[in-house]
C-alpha cells in the first residue's frame, strides 16, 4: 500500500514536471515567434530607406543615448548650426508635435528609434553616439546618485517631492521630465533619504571603506544597483534596445513583450542586435564617446559641412550662428546652497550670443565647439561637486573607477552582452567613415595645387601627404623672402634713376 502511494506520488511529480516543461517550451516558442516577427517587420520597413545615407535630409533626428556626451553635441554643435526656429518642440519623454505638419529641421531627444514610425522616413536623417558599455553603465549610476543627492537639501523625502512638483517650470526642461532619469532618479532619491534617516538613528556612523561604489552607509552599492529590476529594465543593453526601438519609452505596442522575451531568453537577443546594427549602418553619423576629438571632427565634416552648405547668406537673415566661444551657461542648481535652493532638478539654459554670419566654415565651427565644451564642462564639474558634497565622503572621479572590483566589471559585461557587440560594430563603422572623410580631405588638398606651375606640381605630387603639409609653411616663408628682396631691389632702382 505504501509502495503504491510512493508510485502515485512519483507519477504525479513526473506529470507535473512534464507540464511545467511544456509550458516553458511554449513560452520560449511564443517569444521566438514574437521576436522574429518584430525583427522581420523592422527590416522590411527600412529596406528602401536611406539609400543615400551620407546626404543630409530635411530633418535631422539626433537619437540621444543617455551618458554618451550627447548633451555636449546638442549645445556645442547642433545649437550653433540650427536656428532656434528650426528646432522641433522638445520631446524628452513623448512626442509633443505632429512631425508631418511641422517644418522643423532638428529633433534631439532621448526617444528610441520607434519614433521613426511617426517621422517622414524618406526625409529624415538619423545620428547617434555610442559609448563603451562599462563606462556608460558606471556613468549612469554616478549621474543617478548625483542628481538624487541634490534633493538632500530638503528635510525629508515628502518635502523634496512636494517642492519639486510645485516648482516645475513650463518653459524649462527638468531632469525629472527626461527619460530615463524620470525613473532612475526618484528610485535613487528614495534610497538616499532612507539611508540618511538610518544614519540619524545611530549615535556614531563609521565609514570604513572609502570606495564610493561600495559605501553602503551613504548610498546604494553599485553591485546592488546592477541587480535591481529597474536596472534590468532600463539600463542593461540600453543602447541596443534604444536603437532597436524597444525601451520602456517605446512608441511600439509590442516593445515591452519583445524586450521581456529577450531578457528572459538570451539567445533571442541576436535578432535584436542585428536590427540595431542595420540601423547604425543606415545612419548619417555614428560617433564614439571614447574617440572624442576624432568624433567631433567627423561630425563637423559630415554633418556640419552639409548644414553650412544649405545656408544662403544674406545681410539680415543669415541663419548660421558664429557664436562666441564663451557661450554663457546659466545653471539653476538642484538644491544648491542658499541662493538656488529651489528644487531637486538641474535646469540648464544656454544664453546664446548670436552673431549671424553666412561665412562660417568647418574650421570655425570646430573652434566654436572647443570653446563651448570648455565652458560647459566647467559648469558641469561645479554642479557635480555641489551635489556630491551632500553625501561626503562619497565622490566620483575618473580615478575612483579603478576601485570597482573586477568581478563587478565582469558582471556589467555579462548583463550588457548586446551592447558590447553593438559597440564593437560601431567602432568598425566609425573607422570606415573616418578613413573616408580623411581621404576626401586629402583629395581636396591635392586639388588646391592645380593652379600651381607644372614644374612645382610635379615636385609636390611626388611628395607624400605628410611631407607636403610640412613643406607648405617653408614655401610660404621663401615666397615672402623673395617678394621682400624684389621690393627692396625695385626701390633701389627708383632711387638710382632720381640721382642721375
Curated annotation (Swiss-Prot):
Q: Which GO terms describe its cellular component?
A: endosome; Golgi apparatus; Golgi membrane; trans-Golgi network
User: What enzyme category does the UniProt record give?
Assistant: transferase
Please provide, alphabetically and separated by semicolons, the GO molecular function terms listed in this UniProt record.
protein-tyrosine sulfotransferase activity
Q: Does the keyword Transferase apply?
A: yes
Which tissue types show expression of this protein? Expressed throughout the plant body, highest levels of expression are in the root apical meristem.
Name this polypeptide is given: Protein-tyrosine sulfotransferase
Its main subcellular localisation, reduced to a broad class, is: Golgi
Q: Where are the transmembrane segments?
A: 468-488
Give residue ranges on the Lumenal side.
Answer: 25-467
Entry's EC annotation: 2.8.2.20
- Any idea what job this protein has? Catalyzes the O-sulfation of tyrosine residues within acidic motifs of polypeptides.
Please name the taxonomic classification of the source: Eukaryota, Viridiplantae, Streptophyta, Embryophyta, Tracheophyta
**Which of the residues are on side Cytoplasmic?**
489-500
Q: Which residues are glycosylated?
A: 156, 248, 315, 343, 359, 395
InterPro entries, per this entry? Answer: Heparan_SO4-6-sulfoTrfase (IPR010635), P-loop_NTPase (IPR027417), Sulfotransferase (IPR005331)
- Hey, what's the signal peptide range on this chain? 1-24
**Where are the active-site residues found?**
121, 142
- Where located? Golgi apparatus membrane
Q: Which domain of life is it from?
A: Eukaryota
> To which species is this protein native?
Arabidopsis thaliana (Mouse-ear cress)
Reaction catalysis annotation: L-tyrosyl-[protein] + 3'-phosphoadenylyl sulfate = O-sulfo-L-tyrosine-[protein] + adenosine 3',5'-bisphosphate + H(+)
Q: Does the keyword Transmembrane helix apply?
A: yes
Membrane topology value:
Single-pass type I membrane protein
For this chain's UniProt record, which GO biological process terms are given?
copper ion homeostasis; innate immune response; negative regulation of ethylene biosynthetic process; regulation of gene expression; regulation of root meristem growth; response to auxin; stem cell population maintenance
Amino acid at each position: 500500500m505504501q509502495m503504491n502511494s510512493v508510485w502515485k506520488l512519483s507519477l504525479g511529480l513526473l506529470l507535473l514536471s512534464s507540464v511545467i516543461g511544456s509550458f516553458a517550451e511554449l513560452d520560449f516558442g511564443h517569444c521566438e515567434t514574437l521576436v522574429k516577427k518584430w525583427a522581420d517587420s523592422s527590416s522590411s520597413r527600412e529596406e528602401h530607406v536611406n539609400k543615400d545615407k551620407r546626404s543630409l535630409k530635411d530633418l535631422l533626428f539626433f537619437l540621444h543615448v543617455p551618458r554618451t556626451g550627447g548633451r555636449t553635441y546638442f549645445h556645442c554643435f547642433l545649437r550653433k548650426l540650427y536656428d532656434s526656429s528650426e528646432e522641433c518642440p522638445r520631446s524628452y519623454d513623448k512626442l509633443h508635435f505632429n512631425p508631418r505638419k511641422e517644418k522643423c529641421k532638428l529633433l534631439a531627444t532621448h526617444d528610441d528609434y520607434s519614433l521613426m514610425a511617426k517621422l517622414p522616413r524618406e526625409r529624415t536623417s538619423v545620428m547617434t553616439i555610442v559609448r563603451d558599455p562599462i563606462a556608460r553603465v558606471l556613468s549612469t549610476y554616478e549621474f543617478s546618485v548625483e542628481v538624487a543627492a541634490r534633493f538632500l537639501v530638503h528635510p525629508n523625502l515628502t518635502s523634496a517631492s512636494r517642492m519639486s512638483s510645485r516648482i516645475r517650470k513650463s518653459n524649462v526642461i527638468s531632469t525629472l521630465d527626461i527619460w530615463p532619469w524620470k525613473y532612475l532618479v526618484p528610485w535613487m532619491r528614495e534610497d538616499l533619504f532612507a539611508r540618511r534617516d538610518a544614519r540619524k538613528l545611530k549615535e556614531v556612523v563609521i565609514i570604513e571603506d572609502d570606495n564610493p561604489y561600495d559605501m553602503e552607509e551613504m548610498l546604494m552599492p553599485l553591485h546592488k544597483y546592477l541587480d535591481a529590476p529597474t536596472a534590468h529594465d532600463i539600463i542593461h543593453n540600453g543602447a541596443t534596445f534604444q536603437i532597436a526601438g524597444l525601451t520602456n519609452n517605446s512608441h511600439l505596442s509590442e516593445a515591452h513583450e519583445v524586450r521581456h522575451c529577450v531578457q528572459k531568453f538570451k539567445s533571442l537577443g541576436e535578432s535584436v542586435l542585428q536590427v540595431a546594427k542595420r540601423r547604425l549602418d543606415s545612419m548619417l553619423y555614428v560617433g564614439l564617446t571614447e574617440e572624442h576629438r576624432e568624433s567631433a571632427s567627423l561630425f563637423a565634416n559630415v554633418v556640419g559641412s552639409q548644414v553650412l552648405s544649405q545656408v544662403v547668406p544674406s545681410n539680415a537673415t543669415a541663419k548660421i550662428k558664429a557664436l562666441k566661444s564663451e557661450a554663457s551657461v546659466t545653471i539653476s542648481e538642484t538644491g544648491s546652497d542658499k541662493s538656488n535652493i529651489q528644487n531637486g532638478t538641474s535646469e540648464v539654459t544656454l544664453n546664446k550670443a548670436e552673431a549671424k554670419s553666412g561665412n562660417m566654415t568647418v574650421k570655425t565651427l570646430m573652434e566654436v565647439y572647443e570653446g563651448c565644451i570648455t565652458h560647459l564642462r566647467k559648469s558641469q564639474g561645479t554642479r557635480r561637486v555641489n551635489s556630491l558634497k551632500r553625501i561626503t565622503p562619497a565622490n566620483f572621479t575618473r580615478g575612483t573607477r579603478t576601485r570597482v572590483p573586477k568581478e563587478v566589471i565582469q558582471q556589467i559585461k555579462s548583463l550588457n552582452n548586446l551592447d558590447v557587440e553593438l559597440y564593437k560594430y560601431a567602432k568598425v563603422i566609425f573607422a570606415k567613415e573616418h578613413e573616408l572623410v580623411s581621404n576626401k580631405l586629402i583629395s581636396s588638398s591635392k586639388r588646391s595645387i592645380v593652379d600651381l606651375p607644372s614644374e612645382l606640381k610635379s615636385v609636390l605630387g611626388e611628395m607624400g601627404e605628410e611631407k607636403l603639409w610640412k613643406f607648405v609653411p617653408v614655401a610660404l616663408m621663401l615666397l615672402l623672402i623673395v617678394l621682400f628682396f624684389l621690393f627692396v631691389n625695385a626701390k633701389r632702382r627708383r632711387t638710382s634713376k632720381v640721382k642721375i
